[in-house]
Regions:
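Long, intrinsically disordered, low-complexity segments
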Residues: 84, 88-91, 123, 134-209
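Intrinsically disordered, low-complexity segments enriched in glycine/proline and serine/threonine
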Residues: 74, 99, 106, 199-202, ...
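Flexible, polar/acidic helix-loop-strand segments at domain edges
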Residues: 5-94
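Flexible loop/turn segments at secondary-structure boundaries
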Residues: 35-36, 111-113, 165-166, 174
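Boundary/linker segments of alpha-helical solenoid repeat arrays
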Residues: 129-133
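Extended, hydrophobic/aromatic-rich amphipathic alpha-helical segments that build helical scaffolds
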Residues: 17, 21, 25-30, 89-122, ...
Length: 209
């Protein structure tokens, strides 16, 4: 169905699974059929299927999952004029400080009101409802709140090279990082609606080694 990207305003045909997602999804994730802004200012509809302009049949530089990380990209870049732009990569974000604090506080004092206070500061900035509005049973429930804090950390800090260390801190790597990597079927001949490209496939699995 027709969809207007909430960040760039581009109109494209896409599936419902890409519509009405939270704002951080659109900032962080790039999927086949979207328009890439930047580079040489020749905005292009990017195609990740086999013979698409960014697929394995046309390029050696393609995403095996059919997705790209879109975080920290600069749409003002124009390589045709030598403008490669600048982006500050965070070393320690304030959001991470808050997430560290609420995670520790939940382990020490699960009923402390600061947990929802500071967690909601992150969520408000991201444009999503307060945690207790979405999960009214979470406040004071240490196990449930631990799960939600870890999920919030996964979303807020995605593509910032922290997930690897987080799963080891939590001692969950053996299960969290021991599963197949799924993605779109990039060997498909096109990415038409209901075509083979959109079939979820295993992209990589090493058996947990």
């Amino acid at each position: 169905s027709k969809f207007k990207h909430p960040i760039y305003g581009d109109e494209l045909e896409t599936f419902k699974m890409y519509q009405n997602r939270e704002p951080r999804f659109y900032v962080n994730v790039f999927w086949s059929g979207m328009t890439w802004h930047g580079a040489n200012k020749k905005t292009a509809n990017v195609q990740f299927y086999f013979n698409g302009n960014s697929g394995p049949g046309k390029s050696h530089n393609y995403p095996p999952t059919g997705y790209l990380a879109h975080k920290f990209t600069n749409p003002s870049i124009d390589t045709s004029t030598g403008n490669y732009g600048y982006l500050d990569f965070p070393v320690f974000r304030y959001a991470e400080i808050l997430l560290n604090y609420v995670e520790a506080l939940n382990e020490y004092d699960p009923s402390n009101a600061d947990i929802t206070l500071y967690l909601n500061m992150i969520r408000k900035r991201a444009g999503v409802p307060d945690i207790e509005e979405v999960y009214p049973d979470a406040a004071g429930d240490q196990t449930r709140m631990r799960e939600l804090i870890r999920r919030e950390r996964q979303v807020e800090l995605c593509f910032e090279n922290l997930r690897y260390f987080d799963t080891r801190t939590w001692m969950t790597a053996e299960t969290d990082n021991n599963m197949p990597v799924y993605g779109m079927n990039i060997s498909a001949k096109d990415h038409k609606a209901n075509g083979e490209f959109w079939q979820r496939v295993i992209c990589k699995y090493d058996g947990g080694r």
